[in-house]
Amino acid sequence: MEELKDKYIRFDWAIKRLLRQKANFGVLEGFLTVFIGEPIKIIDILESEGNQQEADDKFNRVDIKAKNSKGDIIIVEIQNTSELYYLERVLYGVAKAITEHINLGNTYKEVKKVYSISILYFDLGKGSDYIYVGQNNFIGLHTQDQLIISTKEKDTIVRKSPAEIFPTYMLVRVNEFNKVAKSPLEEWVDYLKNGVINPDTKAPGLRSEAHV
């Protein structure tokens, strides 16, 4: 098993050095397709933080910011050690991404949907799951129903839930994953935790990752 693990580079190193290259977008697209739950096509890698240069650097954080074919902004962040006010920093990063990608004079229609995926290798708090999703919905104080927003697009009334407009946050607690990987999502988390890729994997992106 150790021999198998050694075949594959860490995903954080791949994000830092390899997945920013267009030829390797398939790996990142596969990862995002599995985690977001819809086909993702990356068209651009946006300016992002991180400055480590060696694969064995003991770095604390690496991130990548991308734009998909719908214009959505996707932030993938790997955090190796605990950080004070971590969620506050995630919120700041999302707010910054929103404001950076709307120009003065644009209408609010140009505000982009943002996905923030945090891959965490430290204990953020208590919880029985290894993935937590945060979305914004408006629930009736008295009726408990969910508000659906009506907007006009090309002379057509389109109804959206607030979750389609507001940012989506995903917290992946890698160290809490203790299952036999069966689904594509489980295979990806198993790889993030153990560096193992099943030779028969059908998970989008993982087969490409094995050959990056």
Briefly describe each language-model feature range.
Residues 1-212:
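Elongated, amphipathic alpha-helical interaction scaffolds
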